[in-house]
Amino acid sequence: MNIIVHSIWLMLPAYVPNNFAALFGGGTPLDMGMSLPDGHRVFGNGKTIRGTIAGVAGGIIVGLLQNSIAGVFGLPSFGDGMELFLVLFGLSAGSMLGDLTASFIKRRLGMKRGASFFLVDQLDFVMGAWALTFLLAPEWFNAQFTSPVIILVLLITPVLHRFANVIGYMIGAKKEPW
């Protein structure tokens, strides 16, 4: 099987949460408007309860759909039973946690919402997805995310991220094209 297809397949439940958050988000900010002693918001208005829930749910739904057709196309499964839930939750919630972590860091650095932070913006969600998935389902993670897959994901994700953000900007789902 093509390693590019394999890599993107494994990462789809981590790639889509931020798109779902942008499309279905809004409403109450996760940080409830709170600022830290540095005077900056914890996350800012761009990270909302509804967006976070939509992102995690979207990633899980996409992963469930993928899992239902994986065998037909000879692509890897995300497991079954509890492992399936843990893997998909790890990939999708971890993606959102990685993005939240980057937002937290950007606020501490005094960066405004939407400010570009090269490579951090493109890979924060990957690191979060990998970290949480490894914690929740280490055997599955180690079997699927081999060194070649990890390297390829790190190389192609910034390109895919930019492409998705430009589309999001063009359709009005994002305020910045990065």
From Swiss-Prot:
Catalyzes the formation of CDP-2,3-bis-(O-geranylgeranyl)-sn-glycerol (CDP-archaeol) from 2,3-bis-(O-geranylgeranyl)-sn-glycerol 1-phosphate (DGGGP) and CTP. This reaction is the third ether-bond-formation step in the biosynthesis of archaeal membrane lipids. It is a multi-pass membrane protein. Its EC number is 2.7.7.67. It comes from Methanothrix thermoacetophila (strain DSM 6194 / JCM 14653 / NBRC 101360 / PT) (Methanosaeta thermophila). Pathway: Membrane lipid metabolism; glycerophospholipid metabolism. Its main location: membrane. It catalyses: 2,3-bis-O-(geranylgeranyl)-sn-glycerol 1-phosphate + CTP + H(+) = CDP-2,3-bis-O-(geranylgeranyl)-sn-glycerol + diphosphate. This is CDP-archaeol synthase. InterPro entries: CarS (IPR032690), CarS_archaea (IPR002726).
